Amino acid sequence: MTTESTSNKEELSAEQLADDIVQQAEEQVEDQHDHAHEVISAEQEKINELELALATAQSTVADQKDSVIRAKAEVDNIRRRAAQDVEKARKFALEKFAGEMLTSVDNLERALQNIDKEDESNKGVIEGVELTLQGLITSLDKFGVKAVDPQDQPFNPELHQAMSMQEVPGVAPNTVIAVMQKGYELNGRLIRPAMVMVSKAAPTVDATA
């Protein structure tokens, strides 16, 4: 074998070795690239899962927040309705109490009107009735019950109940000329109209008749 032939073989072997090294390097790079791609894909999948979990958690928190708000609103409504029911019950009980007390007041006032005040023997009875009446009126006043006494005032159908009408010279028509029974208000709201007598205009005289 000549020296030139040996040299050519060595060059071919070196080139082959270089090609093998390059190929191995390329394969390693490709393998590393594939591995990196797999790692990135796995990490991206984890990121996607975490984002989904976060979105789900945020949605759950929002739903729970809405539920809490709705529950609080419902509790507030229940409390308000309960307070209204209690207030209605209190007003009803107070109206019933006032009605029963007013019957006693009416009876005592009628007793004072009908008793003979000129008779000295009735003096003690009169004082006792007056004290009892004043005590009832004071108690009613504490609960917001006040008398409506429209004597000499214009007739108001929202506050007064006309029992009769009468002509009275010198008095304007539709004026309360007598109070047969006082009316009463409870905290500014009418619970019993006053029974009254009302003046009326005199009939018109036809001058041509």
Curated annotation (Swiss-Prot):
Keyword Manganese: no
A GO molecular function held by the record: unfolded protein binding
Family: Belongs to the GrpE family.
Assembly: Homodimer.
Alphabetic keyword roster: Chaperone, Cytoplasm, Stress response
Designated name of the protein: Protein GrpE
Biological-process GO terms, alphabetical: protein folding
Biological classification of the source: Bacteria, Pseudomonadati, Pseudomonadota, Gammaproteobacteria, Alteromonadales
SUPFAM superfamilies: Coiled-coil domain of nucleotide exchange factor GrpE (SSF58014), Head domain of nucleotide exchange factor GrpE (SSF51064)
Function: Participates actively in the response to hyperosmotic and heat shock by preventing the aggregation of stress-denatured proteins, in association with DnaK and GrpE. It is the nucleotide exchange factor for DnaK and may function as a thermosensor. Unfolded proteins bind initially to DnaJ; upon interaction with the DnaJ-bound protein, DnaK hydrolyzes its bound ATP, resulting in the formation of a stable complex. GrpE releases ADP from DnaK; ATP binding to DnaK triggers the release of the substrate protein, thus completing the reaction cycle.
